[in-house]
Amino acid sequence: MLAAAPPAGAAPGAMSKIAQSLLEKTLVEHPEAAHLVMHVTPPGRPDTDNEIIASNIGKIGKKADDDDLRILRTGHPETVVSKTGDRFNVSLPLFDSGRNTIGVVAIGLPYKPGDDKAALVRTAERIRDELRAQIPSAARFF
């Protein structure tokens, strides 16, 4: 699997090689995940500086939007069926191993009408929790 390159104009160092490697390893271990995106806030910076630092669908360096910030600030996950109807997108708070909130992880899972959405959320939470165990702190990514 190839690492996504930062887009033209992205901030220098926007893509974290460590985060990208962790993301790619996670996708290999979880083929049920169609996409995975990690939004992380650099240590000591305001949450409005939260940005995508690892992804298998591009957008590296993209700043958090209002939805991302809402999840980050409230700690409540959000879900949506994709416009094409074949993917269930789950966005969850992303924690480090000390359970400190460091950002948001978005996980896309295959979906068809009638699928158990609660089970898909549990799958996404399991993937997120496996990531958490491998992240000592957000500083590891910067």
Question: What is each stretch, according to the model?
Answer:
Residues 103-104:
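Short glycine-/small-residue motifs
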Residues 44-58:
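Amphipathic coiled-coil signal-relay and dimerization helices
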Residues 95-100:
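Flexible loop/coil segments at beta-strand boundaries within sensory signal-transduction domains
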